[in-house]
């Protein structure tokens, strides 16, 4: 199944696809296409890719052989945390591989990618703030648990979309996912990194009852979704 998004988003919008039951996301802005933590898919199903972003070295986030195959097919850049960068040194050309740490940011054309910390038991995990050309702000939290700095980050960034882990990872639950949404206060929260719809529904119920200003979208894998920039007050 081809997972590429053929249509180009209009100004002030982005498209995304949930690629697997983990934190695999395909994100398309008006000019760039990014894949975050791609695993459990075939390289030939991802085309026209500008960059791969890796959050950490665990099997459900990094498949070095798959990253190598995708990179060869698309000639995309690869951004990765320190531990994943080591695993990718022999898989990706040095000119296409960039190590990234919390606090660092880079540009992929008009798209800005900033790495932030992650509360997860990996060697040097990161989360990513992705800002489109039109300043649509997406926060990919990998499978991080909540951490206090999220509140200030949410206030500063005014996120349009935050992905919230609700299962599978150590300590992760609908409640911990809700806490990420509560701290960051995005316009839209998407529960992911789970093998059950029940956990996503529990997250949605918590959001509805306690954070009514944040909408919830429960994604289906491989389906394309559109997200628009929040309205300024």
Predicted regions: what they are:
Residues 33-34, 51, 161, 188:
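Short, Asp-centered acidic motifs that coordinate Mg2+ and/or phosphate
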Residues 1-47, 99-157, 172, 219-233:
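Core dinuclear metal-dependent hydrolase active-site scaffold
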Residues 23, 59, 84-85, 104:
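Alpha-helix capping/helix-boundary segments
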Residues 75-76, 158-163, 168, 174-194:
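Proline-aspartate-enriched helix->loop->beta-strand connector
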Residues 65-70, 91, 149-153, 176-180:
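A short acidic, amphipathic alpha-helical/loop segment
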Residues 40-84, 156-163:
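Active-site metal-binding motif and surrounding structural segment of the metallo-beta-lactamase
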Residues 92-108, 153, 178, 182-233:
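Binuclear metal-ion centers of metallo-dependent hydrolases, dominated by the metallo-beta-lactamase
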Residues 58, 84, 119, 145, ...:
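Catalytic metal-binding/acid-base residues of hydrolase active sites
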């Amino acid at each position: 199944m081809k997972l590429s998004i053929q249509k180009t988003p209009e100004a002030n919008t982005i498209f995304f696809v949930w690629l697997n039951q983990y934190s695999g996301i395909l994100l398309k802005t008006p000019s760039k296409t990014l894949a975050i933590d791609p695993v459990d898919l075939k390289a030939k199903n991802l085309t026209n890719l500008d960059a791969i972003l890796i959050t950490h070295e665990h099997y459900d986030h990094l498949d070095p052989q798959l990253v190598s195959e995708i990179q060869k097919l698309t000639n995309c850049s690869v951004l990765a945390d320190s531990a994943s960068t080591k695993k990718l040194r022999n898989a990706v050309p040095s000119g296409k591989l960039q190590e990234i740490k919390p606090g660092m940011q880079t540009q992929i054309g008009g798209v800005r990618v900033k790495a932030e910390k992650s509360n997860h038991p990996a060697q040097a995990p990161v989360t990513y703030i992705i800002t489109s050309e039109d300043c649509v702000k997406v926060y990919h939290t990998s499978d991080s648990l909540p951490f206090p700095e999220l509140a200030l980050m949410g206030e500063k960034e005014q996120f349009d979309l935050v992905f919230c882990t609700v299962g599978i990872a150590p300590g992760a639950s609908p409640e911990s996912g809700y806490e990420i949404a509560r701290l960051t206060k995005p316009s839209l929260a998407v529960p992911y990194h789970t093998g059950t719809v029940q956990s996503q529904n529990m997250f949605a119920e918590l959001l509805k009852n306690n954070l009514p200003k944040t909408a919830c979208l429960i994604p289906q894998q491989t389906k394309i979704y559109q997200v628009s920039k929040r309205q300024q007050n």
